[in-house]
């Protein structure tokens, strides 16, 4: 569903992926980031009361480009139906730190997971 309806073009992690992401963003494209992934170049922020390596790209884009962040949650229902919840766009103040924004996004992700924990697909160690 994510690839078919939300994000048709998927960009790989890493420096070259970040460059491509930036190029697409500057050309007016919306971007979707899966922030529940463990990243080696991230920041250690609280995630379920433990420090977890977390991408700072959403926070960097919010600060550098005054970009809104729109959290999205997809819930699996019966018979191959899905419910898509689109949250109110988040705007952050110029003086908010990358760490504060990243931590806030982790808190939102925690709430999404706790809403339906059996639907969170987690195959790697975020706390490594």
Language model region names:
Residues 15-128:
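Non-catalytic C-terminal accessory region of glycerolipid acyltransferases
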Residues 1-15:
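Membrane-interfacial amphipathic helices and adjacent loop/beta segments
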